[in-house]
Amino acid sequence: MISEQVAATIKQRRLQLLVHSCVYYEFNQSIVDDATWAKWAVELEQLQAAYPAIADKVEWAAAFKDFDHSTGYNLPVRDPWIMRKARQIMIWHERMNNNDKM
């Protein structure tokens, strides 16, 4: 049970960091603030250090092999799936902002 929760959190944090790094580095936008991104990155780094056997089995393991929480610049943000998700989130974010203005 714990290993499933750890794996799910590692996957979630990896995807969040990948997508939001893509938004930032490829599209020159920011949806989450730096403090939130850093919190996710530190949590991921700690989980990967505490549970390396689980982390090695979770999606995107190779991309996060030597990850430290300092930057998302070297992550594979140009992956087509990541770029598509980043675009979807930017569209959703824009729609939410437009709805708030009404």
Give the location of each predicted region.
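Phosphate/adenylate-binding "loop-and-lid" substructures adjacent to NTP/NAD/dNTP-binding pockets
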Residues: 1-102
